[in-house]
Structure formats: C-alpha cells, structure tokens
A protein has these predicted regions:
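Binding-site signature for planar aromatic cofactors or substrates
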Residues: 1-203
Length: 203
C-alpha cells in the first residue's frame, strides 16, 4: 500500500487551500469567535504527554469555557472519572487543543495553544456551580483559533433528532465494565445506580 510520507506528496494531491480557509485563522479571540465559545456547552480537549495523546470530552452549561481576555481561556475541571489524564499531560507538556461544538450549528471552533493547571482559591471559587467549586482550572493561552467548515456536521446529520441512536441498541457502561473486568465491577447494579450517582456528582 503506497504511503504518503512528505508534505510535497500531500500538496500534489490536495493542492493549496483557498483564501477563505486561511484568512479565518487568528491568534486571538475575535468578537465572532467569542460568541461561538459563549454559546458552546461542549468541547473536546486534546493533550499530549510522554505516554501519548489523549482527547477528553468537556461539557457544562453554555459558556462554561470562560473568555478571560482575547488571548486567554479558562475551563473548570469538573467531576469525571478521576483519571486526570489531561491534567497529567498538561503539567508535563503544555500543548493543548480544543474543539467546540454548538448544538444545532454546523460551525465548530478549533483552538490551539498552551495551558497550565491552576488551583488558585479565588479562581476556583469564581467557577462554583450549585455551591461546588472545581478542584482545578485549566488556563489556556490561545495561539491559533479558527472555525471549521460545516461539511462534517452536514454529512453526519449530527443534530437531526430523527437520526439519534436508540440507547437500547448500545452496550451500557455497566455491561462494558463487566466485560472488561470479568464481572468484578459493573453489571446491572452499576447501571441502576448511575443516574442518581451522576446527579449527586455533576459538579
């Protein structure tokens, strides 16, 4: 199987991007890009570390990623599985990327930059939700930001409610855990307890 191994080979196949693909790139958060961030309730956080790459889902109420200034984003580290893979990566390699999604919109927003992890008490308190503060906040310096064309969203028909997958056709978290652990953890009881456990630990 022929493998593409050089930039020249790639450009011979794809050519050069059009002006619209390059002029949209900024090194700061422009007013239109701020609107997209403020409207987004979900982002994927990509990080890298000595063990490899990680991509973590991040979600909260719209605007959960705070625009501190035109070069700085702040994102609370809400409750999760406590693996802290992303944070472990950031403290050793500051390179990060974010991909914002906005329900109903074909536009996605890509942000590349560097990040630090802060446990400043006043900063944590400013992100309290239902009286609960995050344990840390990710502070990101924006180096590159631009919106992505809508073709992937259009092709996938992502926001079409008629295309939603029936959850009953998917393995449950309890089933996956039972399969991976030879039934030591997970199972039906895990799935039964999950909704209430999640409700009590969202923040």
């Amino acid at each position: 199987m022929p493998i593409i191994a050089t930039i020249e080979q790639l450009e011979a196949i794809y050519g050069q991007p059009g002006e619209a693909s390059t002029v949209k790139v900024a090194n700061r958060i422009t007013p239109p890009y701020r609107v997209l961030i403020d409207k987004s309730p979900f982002a994927a956080l990509a990080t890298c570390g000595p063990e490899g790459l990680d991509c973590s889902p991040r979600g909260d109420r719209p605007g959960f990623v705070r625009v501190h200034d035109e070069r700085t984003l702040m994102m609370p580290d809400r409750r999760g599985n406590n693996r802290v893979d992303s944070l472990r990566n950031i403290v050793r390699d500051s390179r990060v990327a974010l991909l914002f999604l906005i329900p109903g919109s074909g536009s996605t927003l890509r942000v590349n930059g560097r990040a630090q992890v802060s446990a400043d008490a006043d900063l944590l308190a400013s992100f309290k939700m239902d009286g609960k503060a995050p344990r840390t906040v990710i502070v990101m310096t924006v180096e590159e930001i631009y919106f992505q064309c809508a073709r992937a969203i259009v092709r996938s028909d992502l926001w079409n409610p008629d295309k939603r997958v029936d959850p009953k056709t998917l393995p449950t978290p309890g089933q996956i855990l039972a399969d991976m652990s030879e039934n030591r953890v997970g199972g039906e009881e895990y799935d039964r307890a999950w909704p209430e456990r999640a409700r009590q630990s969202l923040w």
